[in-house]
Swiss-Prot record:
Protein name: Ribulose bisphosphate carboxylase large chain
Residues that, per the record, bind substrate: N123, T173, K177, R295, H327, S379
Positions bearing N6-carboxylysine: K201
Residue numbers bearing the N-acetylproline modification: P3
Lineage, uppermost ranks: Eukaryota, Viridiplantae, Streptophyta, Embryophyta, Marchantiophyta
The keyword GTP-binding belongs to this UniProt entry's keyword annotation: no
GO biological process, one term: photorespiration
Amino acid sequence: MSPQTETKTGVGFKAGVKDYRLTYYTPEYETKETDILAAFRMTPQPGVPPEEAGAAVAAESSTGTWTTVWTDGLTSLDRYKGRCYDIEPVAGEENQYIAYVAHPLDLFEEGSVTNLFTSIVGNVFGFKASRALRLEDLRIPPSYVKTFQGPPHGIQVERDKLNKYGRPLLGCTIKPKLGLSAKNYGRAVYECLRGGLDFTKDDENVNSQPFMRWRDRFLFVAEALFKSQAETGEIKGHYLNATAGTSEEMMKRAACARELGVPIVMHDYLTGGFTANTSLAHHCRDNGLLLHIHRAMHAVIDRQKNHGMHFRVSAKALRLSGGDHIHAGTVVGKLEGERDVTLGFVDLLRDDYIEKDRSRGVYFTQDWVSLPGVLPVASGGIHVWHMPALTEIFGDDSVLQFGGGTLGHPWGNAPGAVANRVASEACVQARNEGRDLAREGNEIIREAAKWSPDLAAACEVWKEIKFEYETMNTL
């Protein structure tokens, strides 16, 4: 006689579906210093109470599933479950709330941004209880921050390596972004650097295409760097994009850059992935390379106000994963960025300790302990007339990157670089003398143009250029 399988109801277990809020909505909970805190902007489906929607987010990003399971009795749910501990309505919005969720630290692998995001945003955004969901901010506790290496070098070490202090660094993305041969590409790099820029940059699209294979580009760019350094007496850099189809190929390209003696490489961290980025950041620290990060694909994730993930979260993740520079919008150029919001995540990139400030979109106080800072890069549709505003907004610890604003100069790349360097130094000097860049900016540029023909020509070309569109990235 064959044995029969008998199903018994265990003590404390009752099969079936129950509301998430019965277990995961805990308004009485007092957060711990070790909790990872998340602020979600959520729009519940009609008929779904906000407490249920918030609890669903907490459950699905921790221990919950759609039905009660008997294996719940084999662990301590009270220790490991996420908790929705507060819900507040969003002012001026109908049926929209900020749900605050606390995640126990033991839910996350040490030093892994990949695991952090897989847990917190990996599954909940398709959940039916919410019509829309956006992760606005994360609080990373110091105990978890200390499990990450972070940026390969950080702001102070970079300045020491470059021997450049007291001003923003200046860069240029080589254009056209695609189609140049390696030799012509290197020529464009040389002209920009000898004109006075600190950096030039591969576009994020440039990897290793038929018109320009990566090794050829690396060799011609290295030649351009060394020649411009010999002529100017300044240390120069070019962001050689090491992003590739496999992590192994990426590391091979970074190793080649190190062998050539160039100071910095680049990675597209969202399309390349956090695991690859963290590996590259470790390699860069071990081998003395700076790491420039491009955020290609970010607007797919963060541009919609009600759904996705705010860039301040991606910026925090990058500081954990590792990068010495990251693109952060301009406020004044062609790419997205409201001033208060942008400065909020710029401070999260650079500063050691940032206080909660909802007026700038900072939902939690963040202590980075000993993690190095990241230089924000302002890039996209900017030119010499923007220099006063950029200097006033971003300050010295930034990279101001002019692509078309250098290469579009009527006299060529080197005069375009001269114009940007003169404009930058004029703004820094005026600021140091106590002048108001926001109010006197145009006058400062005009005064500098009187003794710089290169700047005067640039001012004439771009005097009417504006990008006046309503920003989407608002509080």
